[in-house]
Amino acid sequence: MKELGMVGGLGPESTVEYYQTIISKYQERIGSKETLPEFFINSINMYQVFEFIEQDNLDGLTDYLVDAVQKLEKAGTDFAIISANTPHIVYDQVQNRVHIPLYSIVEETLAKAKEKDLDKIGLIGTKFTMEHDFFKKPFTLSGKELVVPMEDE
């Protein structure tokens, strides 16, 4: 079985949500609640991520995330995920510098929207995620409308 690595801690609540979902889906697939998946979580400091973003230091953010994924590589993982939307602004740069597949939350969300034949999708996230086009652009290019709430909403 392939080994998953997750960059978590972005915030801790989403890491817990991912963890519980992974366990639930794994047990569903195996057909038993008497087993748990083995995988690695590298919990990083979300406030460091926010600092890089506030300083518009995307190179620093890239380096920080590359280091996080490389630790998962060294642990023996076969692929990785980042458990938050906002860090995906540097997804391509990170993927280009690591040796294992890094699944994109943006591309996976778009694939699910296509699978369900959805043309209009709502996005709720950090202000940064909702203001920048790294999430919106792939949807627009695929003919999907990504709806973002107004600031007062």
State where each predicted segment sits.
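N-terminal glycine-rich anion-binding loop in soluble enzyme alpha/beta folds
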Residues: 1-60, 136-153
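N-terminal glycine-rich "phosphate-gripper" loop used for MgATP/nucleotide binding
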Residues: 76-91
